[in-house]
Structures are given as structure tokens and as C-alpha cells.
């Protein structure tokens, strides 16, 4: 006659807790970025920032980036296709689906674009105003040390990238809807 022990098996809860604590900030290696620290302590509620769609913002940053018109056109073409065009940072920008894009060729004398990607917009704020507000918010939180000049230059993009990494956002180094929401600007 064999007797079996009727001891209850308990999971080792301490081990799983220690394991997740050890791996929470583990470094990931990638071909493009040599050392990116993943911050698993921050949770982003995607439903919380989808309210931008109500204000005319219809697409994500990746879709906006793919919609940039890369051909040069004269100002008549730009005005026939887009109703809102503004001068910003040495060049002209057009508004489309909640994003500001560089309008190459609008005026050949003003085609100096420091940044050539989309800038998320809200309401009727110009790209200059949006960028200046982001610079001001990043400076208040210790991420940006340059002048509040409304230019999305390398210093501003670097500060945005550090902020996005520290807050668990998608790292785009650009002004996008999630970053504006987390900064409390929209």
C-alpha cells in the first residue's frame, strides 16, 4: 500500500516578483540604437489620448509621416489642395488631418526646413506656437535647456526623445499626440 502526501503546492510568489523587478528596466539591444532602456513602470492609456480625433486629428504619427508630400509644387498647387498654409521656421507649412507638414516649393526663396517631418497640431495653433509650448513644458520639467524660440531643432528633438523614453511613450523625437497629452498641452 502506497501513501501519497497530500501537501498543497504553493507557487513561489517571491521568485516571480523578484524576476519582474530584475527585468523591469532591462536594456534592449537594437541595430539602430545601441542601448535603449525600456521603462515598464509607465502605463499609457491609449483610450485617454484618442480624444484628439474629435478635433480634426485623424491619423497617427506613423501614418502622418507616410503622407508627407515630397514633391515641390508652386503656391497655386498648394492653395488648391490645402486651405491652411503658414510660414514657420524658414519655410511654409500646410495643414492636413491634424498635422502640419513642410510645403516644399511653395516659395523657392523660403525653403529652409530644420525639421522635415509632421508636427501634431490642435485647435488653430500654428506649428510655431505648438513647438514653443512644448519647449516651455520640457524646460519646466528639466528636459530642455535651449531658448524658447518655437523652432523644432536638434536640441528640442533630443529633449522630446528623452521625455518620451522616461515616460514610456513611443520614441519618435517628434511632437505627436501622445507627447502633447502627457505634457498636459492638449
Residue ranges and their predicted role:
Residues 97, 152, 175:
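Single, functionally critical "micro-switch" positions that shape active/binding sites
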Amino acid at each position: 500500500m502506497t501513501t501519497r502526501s497530500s501537501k498543497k503546492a504553493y507557487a513561489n510568489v517571491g521568485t516571480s516578483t523578484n524576476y519582474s523587478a530584475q527585468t523591469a528596466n532591462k536594456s534592449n539591444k537594437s541595430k539602430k540604437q545601441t542601448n535603449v532602456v525600456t521603462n515598464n513602470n509607465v502605463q499609457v492609456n491609449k483610450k485617454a489620448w484618442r480624444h484628439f480625433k474629435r478635433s480634426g486629428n485623424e491619423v497617427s504619427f506613423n501614418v502622418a509621416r507616410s503622407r508627407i508630400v515630397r514633391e515641390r509644387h508652386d503656391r497655386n498647387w498648394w492653395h488648391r489642395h490645402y486651405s491652411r498654409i503658414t510660414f514657420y521656421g524658414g519655410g511654409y507649412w500646410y495643414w492636413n488631418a491634424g498635422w502640419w507638414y513642410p510645403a516644399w516649393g511653395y516659395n523657392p526663396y523660403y525653403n529652409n526646413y530644420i525639421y522635415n517631418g509632421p508636427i501634431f497640431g490642435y485647435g488653430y495653433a500654428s506649428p510655431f506656437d505648438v513647438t514653443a509650448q512644448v519647449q516651455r513644458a520640457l524646460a519646466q520639467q528639466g528636459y530642455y535647456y535651449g531658448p524658447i524660440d518655437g523652432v523644432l531643432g536638434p536640441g528640442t528633438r533630443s529633449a522630446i526623445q528623452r521625455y518620451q523614453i522616461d515616460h514610456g511613450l513611443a520614441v519618435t523625437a517628434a511632437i505627436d499626440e501622445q507627447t502633447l497629452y502627457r505634457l498636459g498641452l492638449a
